[in-house]
Amino acid sequence: MMPATVRPFAQADTPCCTAILALAGRDTFGPVANAAAFTTATQGEAILVAERDGIVIGFAAVHTGDAPDYFLHHLYVHPAHSGQGIGAQLLAAVVARFGPHLSLKTQLGNTGARRFYARAGWVEDAGDGGVDILGAWIRVRYRAAPPVR
């Protein structure tokens, strides 16, 4: 499978991103039925999209208000494209653009996401977690690979 192109979000991407959030994020956010809901969920965030053959198939949204400490708020791939490395491509693009001071929250019960971030070198911070309306969560922090000697 060919890799996607990762680029900055454009307003014309809103319908595709809305659909992706509704499908891939439904377990977290419930159905997101309109562009206003997507816009509210990502307000003030820097958004990158993954595109293949002119179609947006994933997106990542980063809260940048606490620079240089950035928070990866959303990373979703359309379910029809999951398991193809698109999430890893988006995550690498986020790190390249916003690293090295990145963190995110994930639900403790979301073992798939926890494995995904661990494979990418992110580290769970056992001292930073809590409970929200979705349940127990843990903070995950990006750790740059040590320099090669």
Regions found by a protein language model. Name each.
Residues A88, G109-A126, D132-G135:
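Conserved active-site alpha-helix within GNAT-family acetyltransferase domains
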Residues A4, P8-S82, A88-A93, R97, ...:
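Acetyl-CoA-dependent GNAT
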Residues G44, A136-I138:
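A short, glycine/Asx- and small/polar-enriched loop/turn
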Residues R97-G109:
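Conserved GNAT acetyl-CoA-binding A-motif
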Residues I138-R149:
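Terminal substrate-recognition subdomain of acyl/acetyltransferases
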